[in-house]
Amino acid sequence: MRYKQNETLLLKYLGPSPVLRITDFFLDNPLSDFSKNEIVKNLEMGRATFFKYWTELEKSGAVIVTRRIGRATMYKLDRENEVVKHLVKLDMALARRAMEKASEQYKKPITVKSR
């Protein structure tokens, strides 16, 4: 499940800042929770960079603890957080727009030949 920078619509639209990359990773995996090590590995982000911005996400309430497995703490996005709700809406709007643009390419007029 390697994660490539700039491959999502949200990152293409808003830019690949570390906070957005972390948030986007959770948006793309809404049913899963992850440890910090799993996030760093999947994002291929430096640990120093990750922890610099992770603290901001925790303080803002954007990420929450879901459970503990041994020494690992698992996290997910707090879908009740107001900022997260807006990011989800933006992500959905970007996806809808991209689908509409893609479907326009396949709409071709039908020509009927008369006999």
Where are these regions (language model features)?
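Pre-recognition alpha-helix immediately N-terminal to the DNA-recognition helix
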Residues: 20-25
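A short acidic, leucine-rich amphipathic alpha-helix
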Residues: 38-42
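Short, hydrophobic-biased segments on the C-terminal half of alpha helices
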Residues: 54-56
